[in-house]
């Protein structure tokens, strides 16, 4: 008797469509037999990582690598707390932000009668993880201009709402919600409802924000802010994210965390990277210049794009995006089609170096003209 293992998991898992990351350079090289490839698909830092982080990795001792990590006792905790102007007991270190979302769902929504609330075109991992745990998830429609209507989220929230997930700025649209609206949301929702504010792209948008969301933690203990070293710090390959929240929430997360979830290399690199303000400023400068470069190129071609406060632009192909996506692949350029978000006519492109942006725009012109 043969066993159909596909039928053994619960319905939530059986119904899932796996998260598909941006195609890798290695994968495209193998598929197409080409070597001159640029990747503008996953919102990684085209400058690489901080030189200070790289130096810290290169000078690590073999003994340090051979021992199990102890993130809560690592100097990174106090250093990061000081940098953020919070207390160490308000921090939770994680293997990327995705694990943070999973552990929050496990702690505050699983095996309860509560549901999750987000909005259309939000980061797909929220729904994937909620569905994998069979936690009901409700999604609020967004406006025609791709902006999130906070009033609609307030109206959709009730005492049975366990967690609200909002990315600010949002991925994959890049749209920023003003802090006054986030504050209004916090003031309106039940105090038993967690607001998880995913700020993976915070550093790119910080200059546009009038208030740091961390300033609200004392007044609103149901606020959880998540950030990452993957984007501006260029450490996506090391997987290090963190949450800032009320110590009582952090204490719950620590009870159920997997052991040794953050590795030694990531801890050492992050400890060094925090000091590298020159790298951060260089990354921001390159991103601002690249954003202007791509916007000018889109305008020249009359291509519509969404306003972005991130390190990417999402643009409208006005037809199914796969033809352009495949054309770019043939030319050694990896971007991100957004069919997984039911945005079939849209592509998201990461802001690259000046040379990478020029190559992308040239290919775009050749396709359309």
UniProtKB/Swiss-Prot annotation:
The keyword Transferase applies. Keywords: Amino-acid biosynthesis, Aminotransferase, Histidine biosynthesis, Pyridoxal phosphate, Transferase. Its EC number is 2.6.1.9. CDD domains: AAT_like (cd00609). The modification N6-(pyridoxal phosphate)lysine is found at residue 231. One of its GO terms (molecular function) is histidinol-phosphate transaminase activity. It comes from the Bacteria. Pathway: Amino-acid biosynthesis; L-histidine biosynthesis; L-histidine from 5-phospho-alpha-D-ribose 1-diphosphate: step 7/9. The keyword Amino-acid biosynthesis applies. One of its GO terms (biological process) is L-histidine biosynthetic process. It catalyses: L-histidinol phosphate + 2-oxoglutarate = 3-(imidazol-4-yl)-2-oxopropyl phosphate + L-glutamate. Its cofactor is pyridoxal 5'-phosphate. Pfam families: Aminotran_1_2. PANTHER family: HISTIDINOL-PHOSPHATE AMINOTRANSFERASE (PTHR43643:SF3), HISTIDINOL-PHOSPHATE AMINOTRANSFERASE 2 (PTHR43643). Homodimer. HAMAP family: HisC_aminotrans_2. Belongs to the class-II pyridoxal-phosphate-dependent aminotransferase family. Histidinol-phosphate aminotransferase subfamily. This is Histidinol-phosphate aminotransferase 2. It comes from Legionella pneumophila (strain Lens). The lineage of its organism: Bacteria, Pseudomonadati, Pseudomonadota, Gammaproteobacteria, Legionellales.
